[in-house]
Amino acid sequence: MSHSSAPERATGAVITDWRPEDPAFWQQRGQRIASRNLWISVPCLLLAFCVWMLFSAVAVNLPKVGFNFTTDQLFMLTALPSVSGALLRVPYSFMVPIFGGRRWTAFSTGILIIPCVWLGFAVQDTSTPYSVFIIISLLCGFAGANFASSMANISFFFPKQKQGGALGLNGGLGNMGVSVMQLVAPLVVSLSIFAVFGNQGVKQPDGTELYLANASWIWVPFLAIFTIAAWFGMNDLATSKASIKEQLPVLKRGHLWIMSLLYLATFGSFIGFSAGYAMLSKTQFPDVQIM
């Protein structure tokens, strides 16, 4: 097949001619397109990690705004996003070859607005039942699954010799969302930045106001911005299309299962400890202001 129409096809939302291993193609167009997709993917993934870790900052503060949940219940809220996120990573890993990286990144980023908005309203009403928080925490797990689809998507854009660096940037900078959440949340909950939406602060013993809804609402405008950026700025690669049936043979590879166990022990521990750190610190040092 002739590649004479490659320049036109490489500029649309769907790219039908993609040859990252071809040095000439890579230098002329491939590198620019791949870099653009990478640098839109990074903030989308970072925001996903922020949403994934929402309850690491929110659960520890629920008693301060009038909720009488037990310590075990609060720990459960911090753990459930990791559970649903881990389970959802399996189907999410198959989504990019089916729907395309642009479509899936925009969709999977946009739906994270739902738990963020819902949680913001839920924490302002002390009659909100625990079951609602359970549902919201499980929905936050969708954010954790984004890691699987995001990494799969970026790998298609780069030649093999550059995939390590690209995936390192995407995953490494994306993981910073854990730290960003735990840095930003304690700052924004002290500010009345969403009063126009009816966000009322709760008076604390030291005289300050706690605006817990801010911990989730602060991410909504950024999620909206980067959902739009993903839709209009990223690309779908026709060459990466594959049905679930075509992808299943990878499950027969022993190295996949060995790497999965190593990943569970390393990254799984990182996420688990990060999610529960604030609650654990509060139970061990109750007199210390954690968040």
Name each region found by the language model.
Residues 110-126:
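C-terminal ends and interior cores of transmembrane alpha-helices
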Residues 1-50:
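Cytosolic juxtamembrane N-terminal segment immediately preceding the first transmembrane helix
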Residues 76-94:
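Central cavity-lining transmembrane alpha-helices of secondary-active solute carriers
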